[in-house]
Amino acid sequence: MKTFKHISFKSLALLALATTFFALPAKAQMTDNGYANVDWQYNFPLSNAFTDRSSGWGMNFDGGYFLTDNWAIGAFLSYHTNHEYVPRRTITAGSASLTTDQQHSTFQLPFGLETRYAWNRGRAFQPYAGLRAGAQYARLSSEFNIFENEDNTWGFYVSPEVGINIFPWAYGPGLHIAAYYSYATNQGGVMQCGVDGLNNVGVRIGISF
């Protein structure tokens, strides 16, 4: 009998929690028409001969304002660093040569404007689709022995994104989850290795306001 009561109590508690979660009031975020996200970012470089290793060394910051019930405009800034170890090899330039291993790094910092279309605003689950466009600074660097060679580049940046904001409480911050693809026109290289455009896919997980 005690076991039955214990199971019943747990079942009722779970039912009450689920009912409360799915019956949240319409006002489920901290501002009526504004939005902001702070995210950790993980990316996967595509067709990048300079640094092709995935990495979690990134952050994203964005925010904006809804001009209509569903459509918003805003601004963004994010950054990411990818690394790749290059085994020892000989590099020749004319009559000179250098034999060394290298540590390649690509630092990307895009920023600009964004737009998004959101569904189910004011509820607990708010999916959206968006597009970003702007400029990107990218630093390509190679460390070898005690030296470093680098190339600083600029390019045009564009990135479609899909995501969802989840607000499990009536008021206060929520959870932001997104997936994105990005392309930038940056060109450059060091130590006879470089890039002609930067492509990435990635995910973002963070806090939504």
Report residues per predicted region:
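Cleavable N-terminal export/targeting peptides
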Residues: M1-D32
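Short, aromatic- and cysteine-enriched interfacial helices/patches
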Residues: T3, I7-L12, L46, I146, ...
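Short glycine/proline- and aromatic-enriched beta-strand/turn motifs that initiate or cap beta-hairpins
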Residues: A26-I73, G206-S208
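Gram-negative (and chloroplast) outer-membrane scaffold detector with strong preference
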Residues: N33, Y42-F44, D62-N145, G155-V158, ...
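Outer-membrane beta-barrel translocator domains and adjoining extracellular loop/strand segments
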Residues: N48-S55, Y85-T92, R139-E148, Q187-V195
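Predominantly the C-terminal beta-signal and adjacent terminal strand-loop region
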Residues: T81-R88, V158, G163-F209
